[in-house]
């Protein structure tokens, strides 16, 4: 009996003592991505993919959210609960509605990633590439904030913990400022 207890005690201790973190050797770190030319170009191109591909993308959620809330779309499959909630509207829309949550979260992810690209634009040394990437990232940043302000009363303009929420007027002004910042690059961007 003692041997069995000692064996289980040893097995229990060995399970909780393991502190190995296995990293994917093929996945670059954030520092690697934003400190190299190819990484920054890849991150900028990834904005388009994040924006447009999949049911969680802002393209899908914008069309679905606005279409069902304004009765421009019709629900053919009542099994799509999130879309059915939007169609019914009012208190039937739960706080766990995937369309609304994806619109919020994915737009903020795109906003944050675009800002990271803009913050590290100095990595690019070729003026045409720099201009193109700056304009590309700025457009996606502006689309993210512009989308959020269409659907929500207040939106955070920082992507930090406990970021404050800004009014629609402030968000629209920031969106316009983002787009105006591209004017100096428009002559050289591809």
For each feature predicted by the language model, list its residue ranges.
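Positively charged n-region of N-terminal signal peptides that target proteins for export
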Residues: 1-4, 20
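Membrane-proximal, proline-rich intrinsically disordered regions
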Residues: 18-67
């Amino acid at each position: 009996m003692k041997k069995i207890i000692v064996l289980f005690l040893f097995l229990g201790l060995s399970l909780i003592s393991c502190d190995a973190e296995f990293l994917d050797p093929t996945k670059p770190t954030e520092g690697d991505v934003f400190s190299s030319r190819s990484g920054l170009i890849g991150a900028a191109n990834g904005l388009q993919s994040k924006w447009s591909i999949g049911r969680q993308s802002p393209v899908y959620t914008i069309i679905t959210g606005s279409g069902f809330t304004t009765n421009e779309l019709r629900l053919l499959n009542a099994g799509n609960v999130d879309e059915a909630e939007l169609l019914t509207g009012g208190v039937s829309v739960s706080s766990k509605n995937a369309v609304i949550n994806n619109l919020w979260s994915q737009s903020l992810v795109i906003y944050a990633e675009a800002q990271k690209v803009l913050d590290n634009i100095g990595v690019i040394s070729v003026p045409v590439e720099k201009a193109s990437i700056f304009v590309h990232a700025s457009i996606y940043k502006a689309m993210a904030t512009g989308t959020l302000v269409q659907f929500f009363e207040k939106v955070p303009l920082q992507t930090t913990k406990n970021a404050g929420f800004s009014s629609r007027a402030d968000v629209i002004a920031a969106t316009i400022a983002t787009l105006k910042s591209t004017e100096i690059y428009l002559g050289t961007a591809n």
